[in-house]
Structures are given as C-alpha cells and as structure tokens.
Amino acid sequence: MSVVGLGVDAVELDRFRRVLARTPGVARRLFTEDERAYGTRFRDPTGRLAARFAAKEAAMKALGVGLGAFGFHEVEVVRAPSGQPILRVVGAAAELARRRGVGGWRVSLTHTDRVAQAVVVAVSEGQEGSEAPAGGEARS
C-alpha cells in the first residue's frame, strides 16, 4: 500500500453553525440523507456535521482537486459497526479516484467545542475492513 494523496481540513464550528442556521437548504446540499440523519441523533449536530464536511474537503485535497470537481454527495462519511468512519465514494469522485490510482481511503475525524477536523489519506491498495475502495464502502 502506498499513499496517493493526503488531505486535511478544519472547520470553525461557530461559523459553520451560523451558515447552517442562515441558509436552510445548505445541509441538504452538503450532506447525504444518511449523514443528516446521523447528525440528528445528537442534541447539537454541528461538530459531527462539520467533521463530515471537513472530510469531503480533505478528500478533494487528497485527490488534488478543488471545489466543483465533484459534488458533495459523491463523498459520504459512513460508520463501520465498530464506529470507525469510512468514506463511501461514488460517481465522478470515484472515477477521478480510480484514474489517480486510488484503491482505498483512510479517514480520521475529530472535533472540539470550537473546531472540527478531518484527515483523509488516499492509498493505492485497499485492505478489507479498514478502508473503502475508490468506488464503494469497505465491508467489515
């Protein structure tokens, strides 16, 4: 396994919370139905949603592209039964990853009361159960 790309992104929670409150449709544009549903399980979903947004941005950086290269719904953060975050990558994002030689992903999410952060590593070969292949979700 070798690293194809690395992306890191951080989101300021107060700012993200204001954007979500000011623009009602933004959550629908940024997150899949499952991501939004996951957020509603918590009294304040801001940190968890912001970490998922950071992961989408970090995935773009890991692929060496910017906003507009693919839609936000084409990179989704799902949870393995263990709770481990996993990237599900589909559509144009999966095709771009395939062309870049990405065979799997590593993702780490964290948040405090002020900042959410994600680190995404695109790797050349997948390992079953620990990362998602470029066009799907890891099985565990």
What are these regions (language model features)?
Residues M1-S140:
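Core catalytic alpha/beta fold that binds nucleotide/phospho-ligands
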